[in-house]
Amino acid sequence: MVKSGYQPENDIVFCLHGAEEWGSSYTQYDWTVGAWEMINHVHPEWVGKTLAFLNFELPAYEFGSYTSTYSAPEMFSMLDYFANEYAYSPDPEGCFSDGVLTEGYQTYTYSDDFSYYAAGVPSTVNGFLLQKDMETVFPFYEEIYHSQYDTPDTYNENVMKFNLQYYGALAMYIDQTPALYLDFTSQYDR
């Protein structure tokens, strides 16, 4: 983003956790403690000021023929518009042949974005874990993840390039939108 020469309207902070488990040792309850600590204790001032938290999990692996963005429900409409109507939203090339699904996929507790979402920050994560039904994990998690088969060979340059372009464009779109487009209809309907 810096190399592109883009001049943001708002501050853009790159927060590199490295893993949701950072920040706790010698406990079986390390899941997402680092992200929780970051938003609740290290930078609680981000709540109410942050337009969006864009999280990446395994951004260079092609899990299936499609991708999606999991998010807070109030972001579903904005993400649908961005993916399907916004002129500068990139399409996948050389990966995700079925494109970007935008039916509205709820964020969940398996990644850093949930801690930010729970604290009140509109949050997203690339669709990396669950399939369309939002109940079945991609086979990667049963066959490869955290095993001896999880090697550099899983890296897919086209997927990485797409995710950088797509979420970079999304960050710029959010930055340039005078008021963040949030739609609370799906929350109301629950």
Spell out what each predicted region is:
Residues 19-142, 156, 182:
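Metal-dependent peptidase/peptidase-like ectodomains
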Residues 1-29, 167:
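Alpha-helical metal-binding/catalytic segments enriched in His/Glu/Asp
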Residues 3, 10-12, 130-189:
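His/Asp/Glu-rich mid-to-C-terminal helical/loop segments that flank catalytic regions of hydrolases
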Residues 1-10, 41-49, 85, 89, ...:
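Secondary-structure transition/capping motifs at alpha-helix termini
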